[in-house]
């Protein structure tokens, strides 16, 4: 595929999606599916939102992994930000899942000294 991410980036994105699926208690395959029920869609949107926080993660790479167009990923991210501002229960869920995923969002490569 045109925007296929590196193996390292694939692993990081998959780790975020897997952690979110475990937190929500639904299989990873369900998050990556075309299902549109509210629980699955929320988990998918949150996965995309948190994957965008990975250093050097690009929308096309996240879209490649989630089998979505990169514009759909941008929409998901914007929806999560809107829900966070307008729905206090969602904001609490987002905080919980973010705390669970946060260690995966840290850069793992140490900068090289020149």
Task: Report each predicted region and the residues it spans.
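DNA major-groove recognition helix of helix-turn-helix
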Residues: 52, 77, 84
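Short Lys/Arg-enriched helix C-cap and helix-to-coil transition segments
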Residues: 17, 84-107, 113
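Short alpha-helical "recognition helix" segments of helix-turn-helix
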Residues: 59-65
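General nucleic-acid-binding
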Residues: 1-18, 110-114
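Helix-turn-helix DNA-binding elements, focusing on the entry/boundary residues of the two helices
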Residues: 17, 58-59
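Helix-turn-helix DNA-binding helix
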Residues: 69-74
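Short, amphipathic alpha-helical "recognition" segments used to contact nucleic acids or chromatin
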Residues: 41-57
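Short, Lys/Arg-enriched anionic-surface-contact patches
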Residues: 22-44
């Amino acid at each position: 595929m045109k925007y296929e991410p590196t193996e390292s980036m694939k692993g990081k994105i998959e780790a975020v999606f897997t952690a979110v699926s475990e937190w929500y208690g639904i299989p990873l395959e369900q998050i990556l599916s075309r299902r549109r029920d509210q629980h699955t869609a929320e988990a998918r949107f949150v996965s995309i939102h948190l994957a965008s926080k990975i250093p050097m993660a690009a929308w096309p790479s996240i879209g490649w992994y989630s089998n979505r167009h990169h514009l759909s990923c941008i929409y998901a991210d914007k929806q999560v930000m809107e829900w966070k501002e307008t729905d206090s229960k969602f904001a609490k869920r987002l905080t919980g899942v973010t705390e669970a995923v946060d260690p995966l969002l840290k850069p793992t490569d140490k900068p090289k000294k020149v």
